[in-house]
Amino acid sequence: SADLLSSIGLTDIRRIFRHKNVTKSTSIDEKKFTNEELRKIAFHIRINRPMSLYARCWIFVEGETEIWLLNEFASMLGISLQAEGVRLVEYAQCGVAPLIKLAKQLGIEWLLLTDGDEAGYKYARHAVNAGNEDRVTILPSIDIEHFLYENGFENVYRRNTGETSLKGLNENKIIEIALKRNTKPGMALAIVDEARLIGKQCVPELFQKIFARSLVKSNTS
């Protein structure tokens, strides 16, 4: 159970799974992690997200906004990520490197979604340099907010600025005002509400491809 997992040490965890009709048992080799990495993943995964250890595939995303949106978009497409053994795991507080190492040691498949800014490319390079290019998706925009603005949800940001006139304001300024007025999680919920009104056709193709890949990896893990 999740309660049991959160109460025992990382190195005491054993994950049993089938791969190509062979049953395997995996555990964590703490020698492959620094003390700081062990501390971070113990808190981030074992204590805060123990149920993620039961997943067959992790999708690493930057933060809370992506968690809200991707779960909702998947649901709109008739996909229950949890039922499919897929878990969204935010990496902003922990970093990508230790989470990828953890997934590999436990035999959990994974995908990475990063922003298109400098930090996002840094995370992506780390994964690609380890030979995982096919697992990495970089947003074609500097962050999730700009991506959504440019892919069907511009009106949501414009509406949530609270301004009667947006004349002379560019995309960056409109997003900045909307986020300042509503916060990032608040805007995520506004996007979700709009998406529910429009229907599944509004789900960006990039996200649809990530879901499809995650299901393939989950079902072959």
Put a short name on every predicted segment.
Residues 2, 185, 197-198:
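Conserved GHKL (Bergerat-fold) ATPase module
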Residues 115, 122-193:
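Activity-critical C-terminal alpha-helical subdomain
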Residues 189-221:
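Terminal low-complexity/disordered tails
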Residues 8, 73, 148-152, 156, ...:
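Generic structural signal for hydrophobic core residues of well-folded globular domains
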Residues 3-119, 133:
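RecA-like P-loop NTPase motor core
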Residues 36-40, 98, 143, 155, ...:
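Exposed alpha-helical structural elements
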Residues 1-8, 34-39, 120-129, 153-158, ...:
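Hydrophobic transmembrane alpha-helix bundles
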